[in-house]
């Protein structure tokens, strides 16, 4: 089955089977869906890695804002998109390259590969598996991603200077310099421009 054919419920169920940080006693379903019926299916799909800016923006614009944040799932799939073991889901064009390449040096003495994830939230993580906690799950995923050599940038938008969302973004970032806290649209634009420049610098250095 191609990635485009996998809807969010199928991906959720598949990811659950490989979720190494699922706590004991947690089942594979959300405590509740934003809609009134617990039997409804999430309508959003996961888009594989792509350089198509127009398609990416259109996909993001298709997500409705319903006041809930399943941050652990966003973090989880950021990892899976970079993980070569998930190549059969995303397809050959979007398959993550081997982790070993990040420890191999090119002729300039630089890593042959950088795996980079950018996580953003505008609120606390408050949608989770029954019996689990989205914030705890997300932080554990971040720890494991960094252990694999993935560089994590985090961006908080209007999350204040303290609280669960702030702490999660701060802890998930690779270093304090990889954490951005934007209080308005202009600061958000600057944060992503700065991240883009840093990533571009890494590529140009090779």
Regions found by a protein language model. Give the residues of each.
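Divalent-cation-coordinating short motifs within acidic/hydroxyl- or histidine-rich contexts, strongest
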Residues: 1-115, 124-153, 158-163, 170, ...
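Residue-level marker for buried hydrophobic side chains located in beta-strands
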Residues: 117-119
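Short secondary-structure transition/capping segments
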Residues: 164-169, 192-195
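C-terminal helix of von Willebrand factor
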Residues: 177-206
